[in-house]
Amino acid sequence: MKRRWKRIFAGLLAALTLCLCPCFAGAAPYEDLPAVKTFQYATSGMCIEEFNRYQIKETTRGRFAWIELHNDDHYVLPLTEEDMAAFSALVQELGLTEWNGYHEVDRDVLDGASFSLSVEFEDGGAIDASGSNCFPRGYSEKVSAIRDFFEKLMGEYGFDLNDLWL
């Protein structure tokens, strides 16, 4: 009877280890995840507050975040390697690759909101998704995390988000 409980405990411990440690579960180590090369996320809707665009563009002098808020205010901020690593990790953490190929339109809604997402990875992979009055699972939470990343970046460069019309 004692031996049986030891086996059950060992099995539970092994299962818990697999669940809690992605490396043991066969997931790619953090440094092996594909890095984001370019990024574009845009929204539009019925009011001006919904017209926003967040981009990461590559130039000969490095990468820049290009942020357009309310179809009017534009910000161009240089990105460090640390910023890019953090953003690449965020894209992986959010599981945005699951959205690749999502292109849905609800034609019964005459006015509403839409989005587009385009990501290019250093390894050649890509994400292309869009929706008009249709959104993939977990949309609100995931795009909030994306906006938070760019707003934090703006704060680090000294932009007072309370002074912006958000």
Go through each PLM region and give its residues.
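Short, well-ordered, aromatic-rich surface patches in folded extracellular/luminal domains
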Residues: 28-46, 90, 97-166
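Gram-positive cell-envelope targeting signals
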Residues: 1-30, 117
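Residues that act as N-cap/strand-start positions at coil-to-secondary-structure junctions
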Residues: 48-50, 71, 111
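Generic recognition of cysteine residues
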Residues: 19-23, 47, 134
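N-terminal export/targeting and maturation segments
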Residues: 25-66, 78
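Short amphipathic beta-strand/extended segments with alternating polar/hydrophobic composition
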Residues: 51-57, 75-79, 124-135
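A short-motif feature that recognizes glycine-rich, charge-decorated loops
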Residues: 64-99
